């Protein structure tokens, strides 16, 4: 209560003083008493604030660090009074010439520095710094010391320090001499008085060290030696505690650090809470530790009054001036200048090191504030290599370790150790100290990491990050259980608590926690990198002991070992490849025991959502790098296959597989164009899927890092782990992620490397037969996409990465195809098979055709007599021009340059395989420019038919013979090439042999044969056994055709039905479907009658198909007569747009779904009264079961619900979060027999409610449908076999299309539907060329039939059971406009659009455009929405008129189905050929299809409903 009163008094007194100042200001009164009293108030509250033991490096405004503290309130009161602050600086400091007033003002300014924006004061107020320099040199006490302290605040700004270099050089020397004098006076006074210090009790330290409370940390970091250059220091130091404040800048301690690295503040209560969390975590993990707070309570015999001078300090008043205060303020000035290289000689010359050794000894100073300031100055000097080396050599480290803890000075030690760690030479000397000294250093730093202020913890963590490269430090860290201590830093973070994520924390505390996470992950990465190198040495030494060789001697423990990222990757690859199957690695075992893999995965998942945190990317990357190193151990890999609790987008806890988090990051889902993160994530995947499936035998002898430890080995365990990882990566859509990364183009500087890594992961994954089968059917291989990617790098400067990508891509092709390839060959799997057939084909041609060509050539060159002789001798026909027309194109096409390269591929394969005998019989010879192959010699001779070229005496060339092997010539040519380039040294004997057998020119028959083989290679379906080729007519292998193949011409097929029912031969039905479903004729348009804009959203035919059911955007259901076009009924079903309609087959029930209103879906009765039977509140999509229609399946997000139609009860819920694919437009559906369900890309058994199989995900939206044949599943572009779960085909044209089958299941409609939101809509419009069109496909072989462009965006489409009509919901509005005017257009299937229809439609579109232009000119002032409405309305009315006129005859001819069939038959007899074909085909389909409807009284039902 007293404290509260005092606080209130302070606040009130300051307010009173300000009021008094306002009265007396300008009246000539003496202001010194007012300013002095203000200073006393501020100093008193500063001491109270410091009693809370705040972080001494926390440079935030005190009111921000502790909103309850009175110091913050007082500072705010002062800063709000602009008049007073301006007078304080301008009048009392800058312009006044009265020393007492100057002194009082400087004292107050010094007191309020913790809340002051120093840059504003010292940079914007000209002349103030000059005044301070003058006073610091010449003024009397205490003004001289106050101005020196204020200059310390000014010099924190680097720009100011740079502007006053000369003044600083002079003043530094002056104050150092003063410091030396004051220190000597202090020593002399102490010796004179002989008074013992309060601390001089015994040789024991004042505050005994609690060894058990010391926690340990580790990390490894490439050491950057800091020479003291300001900018280098600021670049390397990744630690700061500055948070932006309205009044205050960073303190000098942080001027060498990154300013955005934010402020860390921990008040007393927060510290106690953190320690409590820490203790709980340790108890939970099963480790014992004493409470660090025991230090005071149990281990000290002294009272707090005696201890406080060494813990928080007591002397916060600046008057009267004492030597301690003067020394403290001088050190405050020197601290920001300590890091400047140009001032180092002055510091060295004037004995700064000896001074600092004195000041950091609390036994000498008896003032923790003075010692703390000295430690800050010492830290800045330690940036210099020379000073740091001398400091270590003269026992400086031991002096630091004598500083008692906990205390403010101990936190200062943390910064000294951190800065010292940056100096590699100095750290080497530290590591060469006696073992107990280095042990104390590690121990002390571990205590700082666990029990110090937040800044001390951060400095200690960073110290270990750098020093893990020294093996001596690493070993001591492990000895003191450092890994657990380090991990506890993040395991106790509130922001990783999934329940509240630190909801009660302030922004500063959240930022501080994130900083802790970042620094800890960085230290963990360095720790495991250092251990990885040690483990690699152990494995190599074991291998060398086993297989012989010289042992590798490790580097001395006091030497730093730093490694590049490439070296780390190589180490991981070596351990995975050559390490034992049951690799035992102590750090990984400890990490596993502490459940830290799940912890890191949670951190990655949560950190992905730290959108405002500047180091979010670094934090995630460090954590990923740790996991990458750890995944060299199979046990850790298996941890990634386990479930982890993470937060979803809504903030609720969900369970997901660890590898899915990694895959999400690799895909770039959270970090757009951050290549480093993607590469780290890919490295984890590579480590998991690229391990050896069979280990080298000698490795089995090496079990562990320590010779003593032997583990039982299961030879199958590594294969089991590998197979499990393949499966878990595949089941979490790893194939999709990796394939998407193969075509990545951004960021351009790293795209090639990301491609290479993704391809490497695919190579490892493709060893799984399941994955291999799926990949082989994807466009990547089936359409040569991977060869296109191999042609050019994304960035020419990254060719080395592209070469790696090509290497892995070639390996991937070899794995998938089963055949070796030459890198860079443009080949798909189909081409490989084709090339194999071509290579085996025997090429022959008529002899006389060649002679005719020769004769024609001779005539064209004017050699008529020779031609005549040839004609007589060869008995050729006399007419020279008979084949000239055929000859010309053959000659023109004979250039080998323009021919396909496929035969060369086959030849390349054969050459690589080296099967000379086989090649001799089958491999083709490429046309080459080098001389003709010589006869085979020596080892190159091949068995087989004799080579005609061997005997030049034979006059007649045999054309029908086995083709010579190209390998003879190729082999010799390879030898010659190597010789020419100096890569192969021939012996003189071989050279002479080659000279004797110079290659002869290619023979004419070899040129002709090669030309014909190239022609044969162009055949779509080449056959191995061919008839003789003609030189005058292009060769074409016949298409594969069955004996009873139906003719393509419809009339011929119709005539053949008598012989070959039922479709006129094999594939007749397919030809019929191609004819019918490529023709659609618009016949009528349905729109809402009384509305300005029509708003249909979905459509369905009624059971007997006399009516068209249309859902509107207002939730109404409207029924239109198909034949008259009149609206027959209207019902209010929902309060939002209807998205789906499905009537039952008997017409008695109807399912509807809406966008957002409750209920989302409903089941309606349509017998005597239209009423709601059941509602499905949360299911956004519902449909009937296929076979019996006794159940309804509803979809809610990723969950499927099955309901009973009679009772409405929920029968089953089908959902497994571990298998979820999270398709955006998931729609659960039954298979044709109702015993299987496809939901979210997962196949379920309805009877057992168990998931059967998860189909791989290759798109984000479409969840898939069953083919009506019940044997296949179609998910977007992929066709899956239900019996084997193999991927059968990919149909790129189906991308992002909704699939609708006709009643017989023989034809498939695909339409890209409108997206739910505008972003998706624009994305899909850009992605797909079919936004305003629908396509038809043959549902038996998935070949496209036709693309019908309706020139408007499609919302929905449906077809009737007889394949007569197709209804399409089209948006009449502009593509770019936000307004929507949707109508339902009815198309007649199998009818061609008439020419007059097309002309009228073009005229109508032109008129619409003209009207829009006129309206824009006339109605500039009209409201935008009204303008759009009017235009669309006028255009639509006119279009309706045109359509009605155009389709009048058709409308009159409408009648029930029997009459329609009769009309079609009549038209088929009299019509022209094309129309006859179409009409007959329509009759054919309708004749074979029968309706299964049970409702013969549909008209009566509709009438009764209306009544």
From Swiss-Prot:
Q: Which reaction does it catalyse?
A: L-seryl-[protein] + ATP = O-phospho-L-seryl-[protein] + ADP + H(+); L-threonyl-[protein] + ATP = O-phospho-L-threonyl-[protein] + ADP + H(+)
Sites bearing Phosphoserine, chain numbering: 202, 255, 828, 895, 898, 979, 1000, 1328
InterPro entries named among the record's database cross-references: ARM-like, ARM-type_fold, LisH, VPRBP/DCAF1, WD40/YVTN_repeat-like_dom_sf, WD40_repeat_dom_sf
What result follows from mutating residue 363 to A? Abolishes serine/threonine-protein kinase kinase activity
Q: In which pathway does it act?
A: Protein modification; protein ubiquitination
Instruction: Please give a single GO biological process term from the UniProt record.
Output: cell competition in a multicellular organism
Acidic residues compositional bias: what residue ranges?
1396-1483, 1490-1501
Enzyme Commission no: 2.7.11.1
Where does this chain mainly localize? Answer: cytoplasm
Record protein name field: DDB1- and CUL4-associated factor 1
What segment(s) does the record annotate as region Disordered? 242-288, 917-947, 1393-1507
Q: Could you cite one Gene Ontology molecular function of this protein?
A: ATP binding
- UniProt-annotated stretches for the region Protein kinase-like: 141-500
Q: Where is this motif: DWD box 2?
A: 1278-1285
Q: Which residues carry this modification: Phosphothreonine?
A: 888
- Any S-S bridges, and between which cysteines? none
Would you tell me the Gene Ontology cellular component terms? centrosome; Cul4-RING E3 ubiquitin ligase complex; cytoplasm; fibrillar center; nucleoplasm; nucleus
- Domain Chromo, chain residue ranges per copy: 562-593
Q: What induces it?
A: Up-regulated in a number of cancer cell lines (at protein level).
WD repeats located where? 1091-1130, 1133-1174, 1176-1213, 1215-1247, 1248-1290
């Amino acid at each position: 209560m007293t404290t509260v009163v005092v606080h209130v008094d302070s606040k009130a007194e300051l307010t009173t003083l300000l009021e008094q100042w306002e009265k007396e200001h300008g009246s000539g009164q003496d202001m010194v008493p007012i300013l002095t009293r203000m200073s006393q108030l501020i100093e008193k509250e500063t001491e109270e604030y410091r009693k809370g033991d705040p972080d001494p490096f926390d440079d935030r405004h005190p009111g921000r660090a502790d909103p309850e503290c009175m110091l913050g309130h007082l500072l705010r009161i002062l800063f709000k009074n602009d008049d007073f602050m301006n007078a304080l600086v301008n009048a009392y400091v800058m312009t006044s010439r009265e020393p007492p007033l100057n002194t009082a003002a400087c004292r107050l300014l010094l007191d309020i520095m913790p809340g002051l924006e120093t840059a504003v004061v010292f940079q914007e107020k000209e002349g103030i710094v000059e005044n301070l320099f003058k006073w610091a040199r010449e003024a009397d006490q205490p003004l001289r010391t106050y101005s020196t302290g204020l200059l310390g605040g000014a010099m924190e700004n680097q720009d100011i320090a740079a502007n006053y270099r000369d003044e600083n050089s002079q003043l530094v020397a002056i104050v150092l001499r003063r410091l030396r004098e004051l220190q000597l006076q202090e020593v002399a006074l102490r010796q004179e008085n002989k008074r013992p210090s309060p601390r001089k009790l015994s040789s024991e330290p004042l505050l005994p060290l609690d060894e058990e409370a010391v926690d340990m940390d580790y990390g490894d970091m490439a050491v950057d030696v800091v020479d003291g250059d300001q900018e280098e220091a600021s670049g390397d130091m990744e630690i700061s505690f500055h948070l932006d404040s309205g009044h205050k800048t960073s303190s000098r301690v942080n001027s060498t650090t990154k300013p955005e690295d934010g402020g860390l503040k921990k008040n007393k209560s927060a510290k106690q809470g953190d320690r409590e969390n820490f203790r709980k975590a340790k108890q939970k993990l099963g480790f014992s530790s004493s409470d660090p707070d025991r230090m005071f309570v149990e281990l000290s015999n002294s009272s707090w009054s005696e201890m406080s001078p060494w813990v928080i300090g007591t002397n916060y008043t600046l008057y009267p001036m004492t030597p301690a205060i003067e020394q403290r303020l001088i050190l405050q000035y020197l601290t920001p200048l300590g890091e400047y290289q140009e001032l180092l000689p002055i510091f060295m010359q004037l004995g700064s090191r000896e001074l600092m050794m004195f000041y950091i000894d609390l036994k000498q100073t008896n003032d923790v504030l003075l010692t703390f300031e000295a430690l800050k100055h010492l830290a800045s000097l330690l940036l210099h290599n020379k000073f740091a080396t001398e400091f270590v050599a003269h026992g400086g480290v031991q002096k630091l370790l004598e500083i008692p803890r906990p205390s403010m000075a101990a936190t200062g030690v943390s910064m000294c150790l951190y800065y010292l760690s940056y100096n590699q030479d100095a750290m080497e000397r530290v590591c060469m100290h006696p073992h107990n000294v280095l042990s104390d250093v590690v121990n002390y730093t571990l205590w700082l990491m666990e029990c110090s202020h937040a800044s001390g913890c951060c400095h200690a963590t960073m110290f270990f990050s750098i020093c893990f490269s020294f093996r001596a430090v690493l070993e001591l860290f492990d000895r003191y259980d450092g890994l657990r201590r380090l991990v506890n830093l993040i395991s106790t973070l509130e922001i990783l608590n999934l329940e509240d994520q630190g909801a009660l924390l302030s922004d500063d505390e959240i930022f501080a926690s994130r900083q802790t996470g970042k620094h800890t992950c960085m230290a963990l990465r360095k720790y495991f990198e250092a251990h990885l190198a040690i483990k690699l040495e152990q494995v190599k030494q074991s291998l060398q002991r086993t297989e012989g060789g010289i042992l590798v001697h490790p580097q001395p423990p006091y030497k730093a070992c730093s490694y590049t990222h490439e070296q780390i990757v190589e180490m991981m690859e070596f351990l995975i490849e050559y390490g034992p199957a049951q690799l035992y690695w102590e750090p990984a075992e400890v990490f596993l025991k502490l459940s830290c893999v799940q912890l890191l995965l949670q951190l990655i998942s949560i950190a992905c959502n730290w959108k405002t945190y500047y180091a979010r990317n670094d934090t995630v990357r460090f954590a990923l790098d740790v996991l990458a190193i750890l995944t060299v151990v199979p046990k850790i890999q298996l941890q990634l296959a386990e479930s982890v609790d993470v937060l979803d987008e809504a903030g609720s806890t969900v369970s997901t597989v660890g590898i899915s988090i990694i895959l999400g990051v690799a895909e770039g889902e959270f970090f757009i164009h951050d290549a480093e993160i993607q590469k780290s994530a890919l490295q984890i995947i590579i480590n998991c899927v690229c391990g050896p499936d069979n280990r080298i035998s000698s490795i089995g002898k090496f079990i562990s890092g320590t010779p003593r430890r032997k583990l039982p080995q299961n030879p199958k365990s590594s294969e089991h782990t590998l197979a499990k990882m393949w499966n878990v990566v595949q089941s979490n859509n790893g194939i999709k992620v990796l394939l998407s990364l193969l075509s990545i183009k951004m960021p351009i500087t790293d795209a090639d490397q990301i491609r290479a890594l993704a391809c490497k992961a695919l190579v490892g994954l493709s060893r799984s037969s399941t994955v291999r089968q799926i990949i082989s059917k994807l466009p990547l291989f089936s359409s040569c996409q991977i060869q296109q990617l191999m042609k050019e790098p994304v960035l020419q400067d990254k060719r080395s990465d592209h070469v790696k990508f090509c290497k892995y891509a070639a390996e991937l092709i070899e794995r998938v195809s089963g055949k070796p390839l030459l890198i860079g060959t443009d080949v798909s799997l189909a081409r490989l098979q084709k090339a194999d057939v071509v290579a085996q084909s025997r090429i022959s041609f008529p002899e006389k055709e060649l002679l005719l060509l020769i004769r024609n050539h001779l005539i064209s060159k004017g050699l008529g007599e020779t031609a005549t002789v040839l004609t007589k001798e060869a008995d050729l026909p006399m007419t020279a021009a008979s084949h000239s027309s055929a000859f010309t194109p053959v000659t023109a096409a004979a250039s080998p340059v323009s021919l396909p390269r496929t035969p060369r591929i086959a030849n390349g394969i054969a050459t690589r395989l080296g099967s000379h005998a086989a090649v001799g019989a089958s491999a083709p010879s490429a046309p080459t420019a080098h001389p003709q192959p010589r006869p085979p010699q020596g080892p190159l001779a091949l068995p087989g038919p004799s080579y005609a070229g061997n005997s030049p005496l034979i006059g007649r060339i045999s054309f029908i013979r086995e083709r010579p092997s190209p390998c003879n010539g190729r082999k010799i040519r390879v030898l010659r090439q190597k010789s020419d380039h100096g890569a192969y040294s021939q012996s003189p004997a071989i050279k002479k042999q080659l000279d004797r057998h110079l290659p002869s020119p290619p023979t004419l028959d070899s040129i002709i044969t090669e030309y014909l083989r190239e022609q044969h290679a162009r055949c779509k379906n080449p056959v191995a056994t061919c008839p003789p080729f003609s030189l005058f007519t292009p060769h074409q292998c016949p298409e594969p055709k069955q004996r009873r193949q139906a003719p393509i011409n419809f009339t011929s097929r119709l005539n053949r039905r008598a012989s070959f029912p039922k479709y006129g031969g094999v594939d007749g039905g397919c030809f019929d479907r191609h004819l019918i479903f490529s023709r659609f004729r618009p016949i009528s348009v349905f729109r809402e009658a009384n509305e300005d804009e029509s708003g249909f959203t979905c459509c369905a035919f009624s059971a007997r198909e006399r009516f068209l059911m249309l859902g509107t955007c207002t939730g109404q259901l409207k029924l239109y007569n198909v034949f008259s076009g009149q609206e027959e009924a209207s019902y209010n079903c929902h309060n939002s747009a209807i998205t789906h309609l499905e009537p039952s087959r008997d017409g008695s029930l109807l399912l509807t779904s809406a966008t957002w209103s409750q209920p989302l879906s409903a089941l309606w009765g349509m017998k005597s009264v239209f009423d709601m039977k059941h509602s499905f509140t949360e299911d956004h999509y519902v449909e009937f079961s296929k076979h019996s229609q006794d159940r309804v399946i509803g979809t809610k997000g990723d969950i499927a619900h099955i309901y009973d139609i009679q009772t409405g009860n929920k029968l089953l819920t089908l959902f497994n979060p571990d298998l979820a694919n999270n398709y955006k437009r998931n729609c659960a559906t039954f298979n044709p027999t109702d015993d299987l369900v496809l939901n979210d890309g997962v196949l379920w058994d309805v009877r057992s409610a168990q998931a059967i199989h998860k189909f791989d995900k290759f798109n984000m939206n479409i969840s898939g449908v069953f083919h009506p044949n019940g044997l296949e599943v179609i998910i977007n572009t992929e066709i899956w076999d239900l019996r084997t779960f193999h991927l059968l085909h990919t149909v790129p044209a189906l991308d992002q299309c909704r699939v609708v089958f006709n009643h017989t299941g023989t034809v498939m409609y695909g339409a890209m539907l409108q997206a739910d939101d505008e972003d998706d809509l624009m994305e899909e419009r850009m992605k797909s060329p079919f936004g305003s069109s629908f396509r038809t496909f043959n549902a038996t072989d998935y070949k496209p039939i036709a693309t019908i462009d309706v020139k408007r965006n499609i919302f929905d489409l449906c077809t009737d059971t007889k394949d007569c009509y197709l209804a399409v919901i089209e948006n009449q509005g502009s593509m770019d406009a936000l307004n929507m005017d949707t109508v339902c257009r009815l198309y007649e299937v199998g009818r061609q659009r008439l020419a007059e229809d097309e002309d009228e439609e073009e005229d109508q579109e032109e008129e619409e455009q003209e009207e829009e232009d006129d309206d824009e000119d006339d109605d500039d002032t009209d409201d935008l929405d009204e303008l759009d409405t009017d235009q669309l309305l006028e255009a639509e009315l006119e279009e309706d008129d045109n359509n009605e006129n155009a389709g009048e005859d058709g409308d009159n001819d409408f009648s029930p189905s029997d009459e329609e069939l009769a009309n079609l038959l009549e038209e088929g007899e009299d019509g022209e050929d094309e129309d006859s074909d179409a009409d007959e085909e329509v009759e054919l389909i309708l004749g074979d299809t029968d309706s299964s409807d049970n409702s013969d009284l549909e008209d009566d039902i509709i009438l009764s409903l209306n009544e």
